[in-house]
């Protein structure tokens, strides 16, 4: 069996950059890692709670964290920022204070910035959320995957691969189903490929969604 390496880690320094950027002593490294996880979880929970659409569609592409001695900078790359801060002038301040309460930042100041993603349907996390929402509504998995591929056409991507694993359609035996459109050169380091793994809980159990998007080639 072929062993699949994570496409993002495989391309670090070439076409991908780190999602968290900070330095720490070896003994404090695990604390910094847990702090990052708490920040990300807190933001996702807040967005889910405050999101105005019933499907719970967050639209977060990724969350970047940069730490200095006196500052923690959190950059939220979001596909549909209007859904989060529409009609709410203090949306970001409220989110900032909410995150600050969740973890002890000490003497460091927390700064939250929201950045809009130009082509939201070219982001694997947003597509995975869309598919998860469809599966929860008991839409056929093939229909959900094909619709997600149609949405990527708006983002001018060169290729996409979608994979769903688990008890699909409530079948007793778990299986893996996938679909590919265009080129997805996983072994080419200069090929910029975005990837995400997403877990969705359905009435039949947990399903895993994986998406690879071939954006461009350097």
From Swiss-Prot:
The primary gene name is: rps3
State the family named in the UniProt similarity comment for this chain.
Belongs to the universal ribosomal protein uS3 family.
Read off the NCBIfam families from this record. Answer: rpsC_bact (TIGR01009)
Biological process, per Gene Ontology: translation
Q: What is this protein called?
A: Small ribosomal subunit protein uS3c
Looking up PROSITE patterns in the UniProt record yields: RIBOSOMAL_S3
Which GO CC annotations does the UniProt entry carry? chloroplast; cytosolic small ribosomal subunit
KH type-2 domain location is 47-118
- Give the source's domain of life in one word: Eukaryota
Pfam families, per database record: Ribosomal_S3_C
Looking up Gene3D superfamilies in the UniProt record yields: 3.30.300.20, Ribosomal protein S3, C-terminal domain
Q: Which GO terms describe its molecular function?
A: rRNA binding; structural constituent of ribosome
Does Zinc-finger show up as a keyword for this record? no
Q: Which organism is it from?
A: Ceratophyllum demersum (Rigid hornwort)
Assembly notes: Part of the 30S ribosomal subunit.
> Where is this gene product found?
Plastid, Chloroplast
What keywords would UniProt list here? Chloroplast, Plastid, Ribonucleoprotein, Ribosomal protein, RNA-binding, rRNA-binding
